């Protein structure tokens, strides 16, 4: 009986350090989690090659220094085609290799689309920034240009990419909301760009709109297809996206034929419009980018008011892209602060 009592005392004395050890381990785990999340999301705008290189220079892949844009002789002799990875009406795109770096070689598909091809190239040159794919080289004589290669392809692959084991940890509201911010940031840049006020015309449906953007391996959104960006001239009559009638709910109301079924569509009679057509489409693109991720419903709740403003039928009543961007960033910061506070409360 005495031995049992002694054993019980010893068990209590030995159990106290074990409990303290467990509490200490839990505390350390929470601290590590806090610093991990803080480090992971504290910088939502990492530096890009555009900000690291002077104008008309590039740095891609494993390059340690910037190089001038490649010219015709360098492209002809140094860029080797590997395989066809994309094809549209305007151009074909080949995975290619240059000095051990993977690049994308774009080649004019047909002479009848030469104007569109050259327009896209001029926009790619003029809009080089953190919002746009990196230009590597140009040879107008051969109707080709070279850009940085992004293996994940267009942002249409987002859901399947984030379902892969290597990217599954990135399938969070942080990643997806940042992609939406990237999209709106590009529109804000496009609407006040060095090349004037530009409108995304290759955006008549959701699939077409998303196909204009690449998904980078670091889960950033980059504008890639710039073949249809007409300029809105101040005091002008606006722009028209193509010469055919547009239909559907995705396009803005002002892009629809306004004179009813009693009058046949006429390109000459169709009124022009401006960059506010891009604003109308922001909520639909955002819903795709957010998907069904945990926390997405909270984000949609916070964005409900700006969604409503973007969907105003009167184009002039819609917010600017910069105003939408400000709201999106505010929601991101608010969500991050709430998450950080929850982690701090656990400590």
UniProtKB/Swiss-Prot annotation:
Disulfide bridge positions per record: none
Intervals, Cytoplasmic compartment: 1-14
Chief site of localization: endoplasmic reticulum
Broadest EC class assigned to this enzyme: transferase
GO biological process: carbohydrate phosphorylation; muscle structure development; protein O-linked glycosylation; swimming
EC numbers on record: 2.7.1.183
Spans within the Lumenal topological domain: 36-347
Substrates-to-products reaction catalysed: 3-O-[beta-D-GalNAc-(1->3)-beta-D-GlcNAc-(1->4)-alpha-D-Man]-L-Thr-[protein] + ATP = 3-O-[beta-D-GalNAc-(1->3)-beta-D-GlcNAc-(1->4)-(O-6-P-alpha-D-Man)]-Thr-[protein] + ADP + H(+)
Keyword Electron transport attached: no
Keyword match Magnesium: no
Entries under Gene3D superfamilies matching the protein: Transferase(Phosphotransferase) domain 1
Similarity-based family: Belongs to the protein kinase superfamily. Ser/Thr protein kinase family. STKL subfamily.
Role played: Protein O-mannose kinase that specifically mediates phosphorylation at the 6-position of an O-mannose of the trisaccharide (N-acetylgalactosamine (GalNAc)-beta-1,3-N-acetylglucosamine (GlcNAc)-beta-1,4-mannose) to generate phosphorylated O-mannosyl trisaccharide (N-acetylgalactosamine-beta-1,3-N-acetylglucosamine-beta-1,4-(phosphate-6-)mannose). Phosphorylated O-mannosyl trisaccharide is a carbohydrate structure present in alpha-dystroglycan (dag1), which is required for binding laminin G-like domain-containing extracellular proteins with high affinity.
This protein's name: Protein O-mannose kinase
Organism in which the protein naturally occurs: Danio rerio
Gene: pomk
